[in-house]
């Protein structure tokens, strides 16, 4: 049941990883190791979970100073991967510690039409996507998820700059996974970049989507796309 849940329930795998971090912080390494082994077994493609499990195994015989505290020869051969995973770990913890104030919404959402039932805010600095529901009582934060953005960050200006656009956009369609390659995972939601304002400002480029991950990868590093916003497939 856990294996199926971890693979398909939005946010569950991250919640379990955070629980492991909390157990480590509380000094309960035995329980953290047990839960980490279970998560790593159920989601072998969740690379950060695998790294944390490896750290906990190593901690039984030596001091572990940081996430991904591996022998120097391994660290040198995988310096890029370790950097990405450490950054992913930091962003997930940061998003947990720096929660939005209850009841607050992005200023861009204040005047949304009642016809718009949901709105999405992306905070690239925290590698986080926030899903809001627009109801008769106002905007309500429903959930939030880890995401990856462009390799070069945000503020897209020209085609091929590997940046994620900064602005207000609408989702234009819903592309089923059956119509896409495995690279896009569970599906894709194209947005209307460039919008009218972008065009007036001379911005170029196209094909900016929210989409999932390839089947061999649970999550991508914080900055790993060509401009799209990428979520895990369950999310």
Task: Indicate residue ranges for each PLM-predicted region.
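Alpha-helical linker/edge segments of TPR/alpha-solenoid repeat scaffolds
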Residues: 57-105
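Exported/periplasmic cell-wall-interacting domains
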Residues: 56, 166, 173-235
């Amino acid at each position: 049941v856990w294996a199926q849940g971890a693979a398909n329930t939005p946010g569950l795998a991250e919640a379990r990883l955070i629980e492991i971090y909390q157990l480590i912080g509380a000094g309960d390494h035995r329980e953290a190791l047990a839960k980490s082994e279970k998560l790593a077994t159920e989601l072998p493609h969740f690379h950060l979970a695998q790294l944390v499990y490896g750290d906990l195994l190593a901690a039984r015989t030596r001091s572990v100073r940081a996430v991904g505290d591996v022998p120097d020869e391994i660290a040198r051969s995988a310096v890029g991967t370790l950097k990405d995973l450490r950054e992913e770990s930091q962003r997930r913890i940061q998003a947990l510690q720096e929660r939005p104030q209850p009841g607050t919404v992005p200023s861009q959402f204040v005047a949304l039409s009642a016809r718009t039932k949901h709105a999405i805010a992306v905070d690239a600095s925290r590698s986080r996507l926030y899903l809001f529901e627009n109801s008769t009582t106002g905007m309500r934060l429903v959930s939030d998820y880890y995401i990856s953005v462009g390799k070069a960050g945000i503020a897209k200006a020209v085609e091929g700059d590997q940046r994620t656009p900064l602005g207000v956009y609408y989702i234009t369609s819903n592309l089923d996974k059956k119509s896409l390659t495995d690279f896009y995972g569970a599906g894709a939601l194209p947005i209307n970049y460039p919008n009218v304002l972008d065009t007036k400002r001379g911005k170029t480029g196209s094909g900016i989507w929210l989409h999932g991950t390839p089947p061999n990868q649970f999550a991508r590093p914080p900055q790993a796309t060509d401009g799209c916003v990428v979520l895990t497939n369950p999310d």
